[in-house]
Design a protein with these regions (language model features):
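Short, mixed-charge low-complexity intrinsically disordered segments
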Residues: 35-69
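Short aromatic-glycine-(Arg/Gly/Cys) micro-motifs in beta-strand/loop hairpins
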Residues: 1-16
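A short, charged, amphipathic alpha-helix used as a generic interaction element across diverse proteins
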Residues: 21-42
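Surface-exposed loop/edge segments in extracytoplasmic proteins
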Residues: 13-17, 50-53
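Generic structural motif
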Residues: 8-10, 23, 49
């Protein structure tokens, strides 16, 4: 979930320590990311060093995460 925070930290409600101040702000960011992930996706380098090469790899990453279950 760290990559959601990195991707949407400027579009959500944050406190001074780069944390979501409300659970709903975090959930809204995650939903927006998942909704928009497939539009023009080519590849991505995630903050943890993971490199996602295509849409299929991104879908597999999401399916394996707790949010994808």
């Amino acid at each position: 979930m760290e990559w959601i925070i990195w991707s949407y930290d400027r579009r959500t409600d944050l406190d001074g320590e780069n944390r979501f101040t409300t659970e709903s702000a975090f959930i809204a960011a995650a939903e927006a990311l998942l909704r928009n992930a497939w539009r023009g996706f080519v590849s991505a380098s995630l903050p943890d060093g993971t490199f996602v090469r295509d849409e299929r790899a991104l879908r597999a990453l999401i399916a394996a995460s707790p949010i994808g279950r």
